[in-house]
């Protein structure tokens, strides 16, 4: 039977705008009732190495609609039909070269044609059929992917609303553009994250996010109350790395030993929007040999929140958040060891303000860039 947790106290990280992932403001178009203006959110995350190449991540948010039906006769005065929104959706365009002009990005969205279909294997899936992508994004990952298959609960807000016999189209409304260093583009292979062994100890990371929402809202019911009264608190876990089990029987592998390992790794966390809302971790110190496969050569790793908690990730599509605290937890890797040992918690994980800074760009990420209707 598992014992109680051992927690090392940590003072709350200082409040700063750099720890936040802000939500898109709701701006309605003046022409056309109930239409949202297309908007861009821009962010810059640099590794601090001037020799590191810069790339751009483009992530899109929008709505799935039924494809309008065409009539037998159409005149030039006929207005384009717009079908009601079925549900919200997210789709990443991936990484590519740095894009300079936000106005061109917004205008280019009119050339996008992405169809949506529902299918199933061992679970429900969504198939994005990329029929047309603007030339502006021809060097991005999405231009090479004519078909994108994904789990429905990760990319569609309410997949249960999509039914058979209806053709659907994805309409992009919001662009989230992240200019970052190329060294930040690293994710751990899923088989490595899922592997468990009695020969190692697992290091998990818990991120406490303060989510902007009203306490009487529906989403607040699935989260903890914020003691500071500034929103709600959500916890998300992911597997950080493994540490080799010590074989020295004369040494105590307790919270002091674990804290020493974490201090030497000099872990720092931040939040961004790359593959959707994403936690970035940087190990600026010594990385143990067993942990090295979980970081790239410069000590970076990205953990998309939708891989660990799809429901929380979808909440963050429309709600802002900030990192309240971060902790590393030492557990047994295999389930038998996990059930018999206590969790050892190291809470002194730094929140990197500069790496999560929305400022430092020549134009405001939340200023209306173009009055374009959501078609």
From Swiss-Prot:
Q: Which domain of life is it from?
A: Viruses
Does Transferase count among this protein's keywords? no
- GO biological process, alphabetically ordered: virion assembly
UniProt gene name: M
Taken from the record, one Pfam family name reads: Matrix_Paramyxo_N
| One function term, GO molecular function aspect | structural constituent of virion
Sorted keywords for this record are: Viral envelope protein, Viral matrix protein, Virion
State the InterPro entries in the record: Matrix_C (IPR042539), Matrix_N (IPR042540), Matrix_Paramyxo_C (IPR055413), Matrix_Paramyxo_N (IPR000982)
Kindly provide the name given to this protein in its UniProt entry. Answer: Matrix protein
| Cited function | The M protein has a crucial role in virus assembly and interacts with the RNP complex as well as with the viral membrane.
Q: Which GO terms describe its cellular component?
A: virion component
Which family is this protein grouped under? Belongs to the morbillivirus/respirovirus/rubulavirus M protein family.
Where in the cell does this protein reside?
Virion
């Amino acid at each position: 039977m598992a014992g109680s947790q051992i927690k090392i106290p940590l003072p709350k990280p200082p409040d700063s705008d750099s720890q936040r992932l802000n939500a898109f403001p709701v701006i309605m178009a003046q022409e056309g009732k109930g239409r949202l203006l297309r908007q861009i959110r821009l962010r810059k995350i640099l590794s601090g190495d001037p020799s590191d190449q810069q790339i751009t991540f483009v992530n899109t948010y929008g709505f799935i609609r039924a494809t309008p039906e065409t009539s037998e006769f159409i005149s030039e005065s006929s207005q384009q039909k717009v079908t009601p929104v079925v549900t919200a959706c997210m789709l990443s365009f991936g990484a590519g070269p740095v894009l300079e002009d936000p106005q061109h990005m917004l205008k280019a969205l009119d050339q996008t044609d992405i169809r949506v279909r529902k299918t199933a294997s061992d679970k429900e899936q969504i198939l994005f059929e990329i029929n047309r992508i603007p030339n502006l994004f021809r060097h991005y990952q999405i231009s090479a992917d004519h078909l994108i298959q994904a789990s429905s609960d990760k990319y569609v807000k309410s997949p249960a609303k999509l039914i058979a016999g209806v053709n659907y189209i994805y309409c992009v409304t919001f662009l989230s553009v992240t200019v970052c260093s190329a060294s930040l583009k690293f994710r751990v292979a899923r088989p490595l994250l899922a592997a468990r062994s009695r020969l190692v100890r697992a290091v998990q990371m818990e991120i406490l996010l303060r989510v902007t929402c009203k306490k009487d809202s529906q989403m607040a019911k699935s989260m903890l109350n914020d003691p500071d009264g500034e929103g709600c608190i959500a916890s998300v876990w992911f597997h950080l790395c493994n540490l080799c089990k010590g074989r020295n029987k004369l040494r105590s592998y307790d919270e002091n030993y674990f804290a020493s390992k974490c201090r030497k790794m000099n872990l720092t966390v931040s939040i961004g929007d790359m593959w959707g809302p994403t936690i970035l971790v940087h190990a600026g110190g010594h990385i143990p040999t067993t942990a090295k496969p979980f970081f790239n050569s410069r000590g970076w790793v990205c953990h998309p929140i939708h891989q660990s908690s799809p429901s929380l990730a979808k909440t963050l599509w429309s709600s802002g958040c900030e990192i309240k605290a971060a902790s590393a937890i030492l557990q047994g890797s295999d389930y038998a060891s996990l059930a018999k040992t206590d969790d050892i918690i190291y809470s002194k994980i730094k929140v990197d303000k500069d790496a999560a800074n929305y400022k430092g760009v020549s134009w405001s990420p939340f200023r209306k860039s173009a009055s374009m209707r959501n078609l």
